[in-house]
């Protein structure tokens, strides 16, 4: 049956939630800004030094279950922001903490939580429209380098590297990050492509921490057939199991018994396998599958040619040096051997492009040419120690995400300045709101927007209030640079954030805070006394 639950209402529930929110946001908040500190996580006895908000948030569990519910909400803010923008997680946590703190004060003094939430949402919506008007497009690799350096925690080297990688593969190219066997960090362009499909089942995941599938030197099966029964795939599975290498399947779909068989064999460790659905639709799907076949050197098993999956042999499989499958995309890095074929294919597509009249076709052809010829910029991350490697990989990951976000939606001044400037637009939005409590929601956002800049200043040992006042009086691009302790044009001095990151952090903070404020009750497991467990002797299996 269900375990005993503990229920708390109103004031008590919100106070406990808030305590959890504060604890977690404060632990994450110390890393904000160029003068932010690192946090040491002691996981399974090997300490890691981390400067990445979402990684810290994920590592914290609070002992009190009510407080942990609050912490879980901040974790949610960090994760959501990480998923949508890939960076800005710390900022989002700090914003959420402020909105929740101010919101709870208002609710305690009698404001209606639902109206507050409405006011918060209306204000944020208005500010995001303002942000879109203010964001300016990325110009050249100087901007890219600046965005990447800041996201990597003010690391110029990483910034230069990302800018270099994007120069090589273009803004539509693919960046892949792996660990290097040496101490050097390098950028190489390799043949490969990105496919807009993710794994069919999360059971295929090999890296649980990042929920991705990672294969090295995999064999590749490509078909436009639906695989449903066991008998279709058993012959192939038996052959590939003997090769002892991972198998990657691209098919119209895999369902029923066939999928169950793959998952069971994967979980039992008999064969490392993963599958994605074929990208695109109709005629174009065929074309894209042929492209993937060429990149991997596989034979495309087309059902109209009678090439059935159940008759497939190992010789018809392609190979890929590295495959990374995310929830919605897959990156494929080819064996060096398929280079000539890829180039021939690109030449053929360019010829088709010059001959077509259809705008739609030419767009799609151009996209395929870009995917095939752009290749994949592989950043091989080197470091002297495991701890340093992990920290550097997280920083490069952040920098990569921030850079693509900047290319997508433009850039704004960093250092929390964009939020402070946005706060000056709140009164105008508030004018359009009638309801008294909704207007309080607008006030809450106006105050909360100052928190990130204030914390960046405090982390640098400077009085936050003073900084905020100064930024407010200045132009949009001006702000406080905590690195140099000067007020200056942040865009010119390269302190810039992607508008997308600024937007997502605010939206996610507001959305989760709205949930907290409209919470009347929390139900959590009653903490049970932990039974004492006898430790197994060294070297013995614990059963």
Swiss-Prot record:
Belongs to the chaperonin (HSP60) family. One of its GO terms (biological process) is protein folding. GO terms for molecular function: ATP binding; ATP-dependent protein folding chaperone. It holds the Pfam family Cpn60_TCP1. NCBIfam families: GroEL, PRK00013.1, PRK12849.1, PRK12850.1, PRK12851.1. The keyword Magnesium does not apply. Oligomer of probably six alpha and six beta subunits. This is RuBisCO large subunit-binding protein subunit alpha, chloroplastic.
């Amino acid at each position: 049956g269900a375990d005993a639950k503990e229920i708390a209402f109103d004031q008590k529930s919100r106070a406990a939630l808030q305590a959890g929110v504060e604890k977690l946001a404060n632990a994450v908040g110390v890393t904000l800004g160029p003068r932010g500190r690192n946090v040491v996580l002691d996981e399974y006895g090997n300490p890691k030094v981390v400067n990445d908000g979402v990684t810290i948030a994920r590592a914290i569990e609070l002992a009190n279950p009510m407080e942990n519910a609050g912490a879980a909400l901040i974790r949610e803010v960090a994760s959501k922001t990480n998923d949508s923008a890939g960076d800005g997680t710390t900022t989002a946590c700090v914003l959420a903490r402020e909105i929740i703190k101010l919101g709870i004060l208002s609710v305690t003094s009698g404001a209606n939580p639902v109206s507050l939430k409405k006011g918060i949402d209306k204000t944020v919506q208005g500010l995001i429209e303002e942000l879109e008007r203010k964001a300016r497009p990325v110009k050249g690799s100087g901007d890219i380098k600046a965005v990447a350096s800041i996201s990597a925690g003010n690391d110029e080297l990483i910034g230069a590297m990302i800018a270099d990688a994007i120069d090589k593969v273009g803004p539509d190219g693919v960046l892949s990050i792996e660990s290097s066997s040496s101490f050097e960090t390098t950028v190489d362009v390799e043949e490969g492509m990105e496919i807009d499909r993710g794994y069919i089942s999360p059971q295929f995941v090999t890296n649980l921490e990042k929920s991705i599938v990672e294969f090295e030197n995999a064999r590749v099966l490509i078909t436009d057939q639906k695989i449903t029964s066991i008998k279709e795939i058993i012959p192939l599975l038996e052959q590939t199991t003997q090769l002892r290498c991972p198998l990657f399947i691209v098919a119209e779909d895999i369902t029923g018994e066939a999928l169950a068989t793959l998952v069971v064999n994967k979980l039992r460790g008999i064969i490392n396998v993963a599958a994605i659905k074929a990208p695109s639709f109709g005629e174009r799907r065929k074309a894209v599958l042929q492209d993937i076949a060429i990149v991997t050197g596989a034979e495309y098993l087309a059902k109209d040619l009678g090439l059935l999956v159940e008759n497939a042999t190992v010789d018809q499989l392609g190979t890929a040096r590295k495959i990374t499958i995310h929830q919605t995309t897959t990156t494929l890095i080819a064996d060096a051997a398929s280079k000539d074929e890829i180039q021939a294919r690109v030449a053929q597509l360019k010829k088709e492009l010059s001959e077509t009249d259809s705008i739609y076709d030419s767009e799609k052809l151009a996209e395929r040419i870009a995917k095939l010829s752009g290749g994949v910029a592989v950043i091989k991350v080197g470091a002297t120690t495991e701890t340093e490697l992990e920290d550097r990989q997280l920083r490069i990951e952040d920098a990569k995400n921030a850079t693509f976000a900047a290319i997508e939606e433009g850039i704004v001044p960093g250092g929390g300045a964009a939020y402070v400037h946005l706060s000056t637009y709140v009164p105008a939005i508030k004018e359009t709101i009638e309801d008294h409590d909704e207007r309080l929601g607008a006030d809450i956002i106006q105050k909360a927007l100052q928190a990130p800049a204030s914390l960046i200043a405090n982390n640098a040992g400077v009085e936050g209030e003073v900084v905020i006042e100064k930024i407010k009086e200045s132009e949009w691009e001006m702000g406080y640079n905590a690195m140099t302790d000067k007020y200056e044009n942040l865009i010119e001095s390269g302190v810039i954030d992607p508008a997308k990151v600024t937007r997502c952090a605010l939206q996610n903070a507001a959305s989760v805070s709205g949930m907290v404020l409209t919470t009347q009750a929390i139900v959590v497991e009653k903490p049970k006394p932990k039974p004492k467990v006898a430790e197994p002797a060294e070297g013995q299996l614990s059963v």
